[in-house]
């Protein structure tokens, strides 16, 4: 449910500026760090602090401007929970309705992340994960068409699969992988013996 702030004026402007500032901090992060490394642990702590700040601001209602909605959605998409990503998808959908460039893709990506965290197939195929051997798309719902992807600013499935196959980054230490990823690796046949 969309609950815009009932109050007008400085509070709304300050909150929008704060959300956009949090997004700038998020986008300035070096995300090319391997899971389990100290730099990754520190990154996730900063991500968590930004999400907590966003949730406090959203407690008074959703922002009314597209850029602030987009900023909040982007930060929640870096969450650890399906519910955070699902809220990010709804915020991005509203930002798209208001005409924010990039918001349709973000709504799709956040929905996919929410589904992935719930151990369900993605709708669009935006999440690429390590599988202990290489990089792959998290499972994708075969009923979703490339036309649906394109309508949401997501590349066709074959292009996303090629992107995953082209990644040559080292695999993170899978000993600390989330249980959901370890179960998926078992399903994919890539989980190394214990």
Please annotate each region the language model reported.
Residues 77-81, 151:
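Alpha-helix C-terminal capping/termination sites
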Residues 41-53, 82-85:
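Helix-turn-helix repeat elements of alpha-solenoid scaffolds
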Residues 9-37, 64-78, 102-118:
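Amphipathic alpha-helical repeat scaffolds of TPR domains
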Residues 86-101, 128-129:
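TPR/TPR-like (Sel1-like) alpha-helical repeat modules
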Residues 54-57, 61, 95:
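Alpha-helical solenoid scaffolds that mediate protein-protein interactions
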Residues 66, 82-89, 104-105, 158:
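Conserved positions within tetratricopeptide repeat
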Residues 65, 110-194:
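Terminal, low-structured helical/coil segments at or just beyond the last alpha-helical repeat
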């Amino acid at each position: 449910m969309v609950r815009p702030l009932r109050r007008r004026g400085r509070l709304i402007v300050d909150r929008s500026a704060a959300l956009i500032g949090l997004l700038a901090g998020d986008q300035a992060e070096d995300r090319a760090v391997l899971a389990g490394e100290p730099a990754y642990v520190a990154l996730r702590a900063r991500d968590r602090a930004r999400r907590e700040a966003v949730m406090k601001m959203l407690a008074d209602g959703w922002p009314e401007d597209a850029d602030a909605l987009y900023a909040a959605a982007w930060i929640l998409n870096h969450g650890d929970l399906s519910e955070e990503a699902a809220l990010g998808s709804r915020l991005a959908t509203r930002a798209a309705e208001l005409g924010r460039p990039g918001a349709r893709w973000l709504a799709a990506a956040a929905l996919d992340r929410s589904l992935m965290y719930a151990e369900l197939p993605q709708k669009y195929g935006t999440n690429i994960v390590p599988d202990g051997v290489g990089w792959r798309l998290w499972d994708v719902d075969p009923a979703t068409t490339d036309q649906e992807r394109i309508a949401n600013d997501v590349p066709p499935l074959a292009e996303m699969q090629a992107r995953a196959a082209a990644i040559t980054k080292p695999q993170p230490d899978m000993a600390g992988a989330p249980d959901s990823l370890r179960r998926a690796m078992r399903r994919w046949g890539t989980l190394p013996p214990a």
